[in-house]
Amino acid sequence: MISKRRFSLPRLDITGMWVFSLGVWFHIVARLVYSKPWMAFFLAELIAAILVLFGAYQVLDAWIARVSREEREALEARQQAMMEGQQEGGHVSH
């Protein structure tokens, strides 16, 4: 019987990504420091650049989501006010 559930890794937040990357980095650096110190330094710079870009992407993504939610709420409030104004204007009392 074949399972219909696909295997997927959990999505890491930026803190989890930092911890994971530092663990991988320390593991690799432990092997490279004595044999190729320049490669260990290059790897540190590469991982730092990737983490900064990934973190900046997540920060921008959260900011864009917040701004668009606020704009949507403001638009809904304006539409609601316009509908209420039209309903009040349509009712004429004698």
UniProtKB/Swiss-Prot annotation:
Q: Which residues cross the membrane?
A: 14-34, 37-57
Which InterPro entries does this chain map to? TraQ_proteobacteria
Give a yes or no for keyword Cell membrane in this entry.
Answer: yes
Which compartment or compartments is the protein found in?
Cell inner membrane
A Pfam match: TraQ
Q: Which organism is it from?
A: Escherichia coli (strain K12)
UniProt entry keywords in alphabetical sequence: Cell inner membrane, Cell membrane, Conjugation, Membrane, Plasmid, Transmembrane, Transmembrane helix
Please report the record's description of how this protein sits within the membrane: Multi-pass membrane protein
Q: What is this protein called in UniProt?
A: Protein TraQ
Listed GO CC annotations: plasma membrane
UniProt main location, coarse = membrane
Say what the protein does.
Answer: Required for efficient expression of pilin. Functions as a transient chaperone for propilin, preventing it from being prematurely degraded, and also promotes propilin translocation, positioning it in the membrane for processing to mature pilin.
Would you indicate the residue range of the signal peptide? none
- The organism's place on the tree of life at top rank: Bacteria
Its quaternary structure?
Interacts with pilin.
Q: Quick check: keyword Flavoprotein in the entry? A: no
